[in-house]
UniProtKB/Swiss-Prot annotation:
Annotated EC: 3.1.1.4
Cofactor(s) this protein requires: Ca(2+)
Lineage start: Eukaryota, Metazoa, Chordata, Craniata, Vertebrata
CC cofactor note: Binds 1 Ca(2+) ion.
InterPro entries: PLipase_A2, PLipase_A2_Asp_AS, PLipase_A2_dom, PLipase_A2_dom_sf, PLipase_A2_His_AS
SMART domains in alphabetical order: PA2c
Any one Gene Ontology cellular component term annotated for this protein: extracellular region
PANTHER family, A to Z: PHOSPHOLIPASE A2, PHOSPHOLIPASE A2 FAMILY MEMBER
Residue intervals passing through the bilayer: none
The UniProt record lists the keyword DNA repair: no
Active site (catalytic residues): 46, 92
UniProt name for this protein: Basic phospholipase A2 nigroxin A
Length: 118
């Protein structure tokens, strides 16, 4: 879920999680157009993963609680999750790891989606 995604970001990243809430065309609520960079692409992939969870697993990914471990920047989804919980956990895990390795461009924070996301 979104709260756990925030905590996963905190586990893998030195940058504050708020930096990812309104970045590019896909990081934050909604998303459209072409991702502006690699980090924005991470968010687009995460959005698509959540869409798949909704349609294939029939669950609400933004509200689904799952079990995971964070140790020294490493994230592990626990084995005791249901199929849906495991799917959502892996969506969030993949996004957090992607955020950690993608370059952050300050000019893409809080861009105007009506101008930059066509």
């Amino acid at each position: 879920n979104l709260y756990q995604l925030k905590n996963m970001i905190k586990c893998t990243n030195t940058r504050h999680w708020v930096s990812f809430t309104n970045y590019g065309c896909y990081c934050g609520y909604g998303g459209s157009g072409t991702p502006v960079d690699e980090l924005d692409k991470c968010c687009q992939v995460h959005d698509k993963c959540y869409d798949t969870a909704k349609h294939v697993c029939k669950c609400s990914p933004s509200m689904t609680m799952y079990s995971y471990d964070c140790s020294e920047g490493k994230l592990t989804c626990k084995d005791n999750n249901t199929k849906c919980k495991d799917f959502v956990c892996n969506c969030d895990r993949t996004a957090a790891l992607c955020f950690a390795k993608a370059p952050y461009n300050n000019k893409n924070f809080k861009i105007d989606p009506t101008k930059g996301c066509q």
